Swiss-Prot record:
GO terms for cellular component: cytoplasm. This is Imidazoleglycerol-phosphate dehydratase. The keyword DNA damage does not apply. GO terms for molecular function: imidazoleglycerol-phosphate dehydratase activity. It is found in: Cytoplasm. Keywords: Amino-acid biosynthesis, Cytoplasm, Histidine biosynthesis, Lyase. The gene is hisB. Gene3D superfamilies: Imidazole glycerol phosphate dehydratase, domain 1. It catalyses: D-erythro-1-(imidazol-4-yl)glycerol 3-phosphate = 3-(imidazol-4-yl)-2-oxopropyl phosphate + H2O. Its EC number is 4.2.1.19. PROSITE patterns: IGP_DEHYDRATASE_2 (PS00955). The keyword Signal does not apply.
Amino acid sequence: MSRRAAVKTPRAGAAARRGAVARRTKETDVAVELRLEPGEAAISTGLPFFDHMLDQISRHGGMALTVRAKGDLQVDAHHTVEDVGIGLGEALRQALEDKAGLARYGHAVVPLDEALVEAVVDLSGRPHLTFNAKLPSGKKFIGGYDVDLTQDFLQALVNHARICVHVNVRYGRNLHHVVEAIFKATARALRAATAREGTALPSTKGTL
């Protein structure tokens, strides 16, 4: 895992539902901005397939998203993918603020041709990822993207957003379809969980 050397911008306030993070290490330079309402995506990580997946998070998550990342791709893509997950998680945590008035729970089942993926999200304040995904055997890379990094990305996102996510790949033959459905289902579950439902905090504990 990358050594952390983060510099964060101040929180923009609950009403804005915005988050922004700048994070620089010896391995990567990452900047993430998001707003929890539909908007444009501007993604550049040096990994075209990963850019495409982050665009799915923006589109299906109902969020405006900007991600700029430069990493040591000559070594491996792991640092870049993981650090983008860290930045996105921290920005999401800022945007959620105290979670008052949010649905808290979200669930989505997304098909992509022969692939079917389920994702469930709880804005619990307790980081947890269950990644139940037996990916199709054989092919491991999609356009230079190591599919194993999908779990690492989600783990970083979960840890830094402090949310609970369960992903279940029910079935699928085409690796591209399976991975894309994972991102789409997670995004749609996040969109449902972050939807507004009044003003009350969705917890009997009084905090999340």
